[in-house]
């Protein structure tokens, strides 16, 4: 859909030439009906996926959720009413329905553009100011920005569309047609096209270029960091199994007859892992940046007390450490770790940067797909708007109709972009379409590294 000109553009051309054959009418009706169905289905899947899969409830996906709401409005109302308009050859639903349709159409379309801008700025600041911006990047603030985007879109278009005829004292829209009255002049249409399409696209492309440059710089820094690693003899990080062997230094053997008090506790903690997971959502805030202030490579041992079932009374002595220890980064552990642990600092720093870089690239890939779809579907119509400003009769009627419908198709493509670039969306879509979501709820769902996760299970 478009925010720069009325359907079938200006009043100097006929909306749809009468006398189209039945095969043409059938083809237009079936094609546009299928596109509308695909748009509604795809964006409903986005909304349902966000509801049922908690992994998708990230700050970045809040913006995608808002974009899906705008696309759902377009697929439900705008596409079908415009198809009726085309097939009948005139507007037969009255002036009030015309103005309400245009207001809803243009508000939803402008909200789509605003949401794309929000996504672009969010990605830009996340990459260029990862510490200061992400501290302020909360769901509440994201919801506030989304609400502001919709409010601005409503204020810009709805009052002008609905009340312009009362401001000027008359309605000049031709009988049987439906278009925005104040856009009947090509020069005004040109100005709105510049403000509603060309300016936002320029800003988004500039931001994407800056994101790309910053990501490439980080990739080069990471390559240099990895190239400078020189593991020493016996250095590097030992595996967790090696560190937890009975009899190893710092982990005395557990006396026989003792058992772990926590053996039936829910599985709440996962060991810190720097392994890249494909299930990682690109907008997730559950990254390892929370330990930025901690010294890489340091660790502390969290000792899990062991209880002797034969003991008659509790003792005041501290519990002995056991092989079941969990290690996590902290500030003071490096000096206690010994000389053999020194090379782990650079290694873990490199892995943390790799993890962050992978997330940024995935997020940039989603943004690039959405931005590319937006440009490809909206540009033809807006080029025709510019041409009509200088040559009123140079654009054929059929091209106007195709160009305007191509803007609508952007709402159909967006959910496909989410699925292609985001494995979490793709898997959730598949399970919902196969009616297998309930089964998934009771199996272990892979989580991102370092996250706190309770494994779905009927048992403790």
From Swiss-Prot:
Query: Which spans does this entry mark as compositional bias, Basic residues?
Result: 328-343
Q: Where are the transmembrane segments?
A: 23-48, 63-84, 96-121, 143-164, 186-209, 367-390, 398-420
Q: Which residues are glycosylated?
A: 2, 12
What GO CC annotations are associated with the protein?
A: axon terminus; cholinergic synapse; dendrite; glutamatergic synapse; membrane; plasma membrane; postsynaptic density membrane; presynaptic membrane
Residue numbers on the Extracellular membrane side? 1-22, 85-95, 165-185, 391-397
Select a single GO molecular function from the record's annotations and give it: phosphatidylinositol-4,5-bisphosphate phospholipase C activity
**Which parts of the chain does the record assign to the membrane side Cytoplasmic?**
49-62, 122-142, 210-366, 421-460
Where is the stretch described as Disordered?
225-256, 274-297, 310-351
Localization of this protein: Cell membrane; Postsynaptic cell membrane
Site location (Binds to snake venom muscarinic toxin 7):
172
Residues modified as Phosphothreonine are 230, 428, 455
Where is the site labelled Subtype-specific residue that binds to snake venom muscarinic toxin 7? 170, 174, 397, 401
Query: Keyword Transmembrane helix, does the record have it?
Result: yes
Topological relation to the membrane, as annotated: Multi-pass membrane protein
Chief location category: membrane
The disulfides recorded in the entry are 98-178
Subunit and interaction comment: Interacts with GPRASP2. Interacts with TMEM147.
Q: What does this protein do?
A: The muscarinic acetylcholine receptor mediates various cellular responses, including inhibition of adenylate cyclase, breakdown of phosphoinositides and modulation of potassium channels through the action of G proteins. Primary transducing effect is Pi turnover.
Give the family from UniProt: Belongs to the G-protein coupled receptor 1 family. Muscarinic acetylcholine receptor subfamily. CHRM1 sub-subfamily.
Name of this chain's protein: Muscarinic acetylcholine receptor M1
Q: Which gene encodes it?
A: CHRM1
